[in-house]
C-alpha cells in the first residue's frame, strides 16, 4: 500500500520562511531517501516552495481566478512530502518516525485511497 507522508514546517521553526533546510538536515534527508530506495519503500519525494510562492486557482464558476499566496494563512505549512510503499500502517508509521527525525520536522501520514 502507498502512503503520503507530509512534511510540516512552520515559519518559526528550524527552516527559514523560504522553506530551506540546513545542510545537516539535507544530508540526513538524503541518507534517509537512500535507505528508502534500498529497502524498496521509495516511490517519490520532493520539497515544495515557500507558501509565498503559491498561487490558488479557482475555476468552479467556469472562469478561472488566480490568487497569489497560500490558500490558508497559517504558521504551519506543507514543506515537502514522501510517497512511500509499505505493507501496512505500522511500517508506514515507523518509516514516518524516521523521516521526521531525519528532516527535523513533524510529519503526517495518510494512506492513498
Task: Please give the residue ranges for each predicted region.
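Conserved, structured core segments of small domains
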Residues: 1-113
Amino acid at each position: 500500500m502507498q502512503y503520503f507522508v507530509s512534511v510540516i514546517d512552520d515559519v518559526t521553526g528550524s527552516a527559514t520562511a523560504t522553506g530551506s533546510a540546513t545542510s545537516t538536515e539535507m544530508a540526513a534527508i538524503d541518507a534517509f531517501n537512500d535507505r528508502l530506495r534500498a529497502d524498496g519503500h521509495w516511490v517519490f519525494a520532493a520539497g515544495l516552495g515557500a507558501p509565498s510562492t503559491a498561487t490558488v486557482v479557482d475555476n468552479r464558476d467556469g472562469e478561472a481566478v488566480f490568487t497569489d499566496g497560500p490558500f490558508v494563512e497559517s504558521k504551519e505549512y506543507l514543506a515537502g512530502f514522501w510517497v512511500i510503499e509499505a505493507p501496512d500502517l505500522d511500517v508506514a508509521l515507523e518509516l514516518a518516525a524516521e523521516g521526521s527525525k531525519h528532516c527535523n520536522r513533524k510529519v503526517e501520514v495518510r494512506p492513498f485511497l
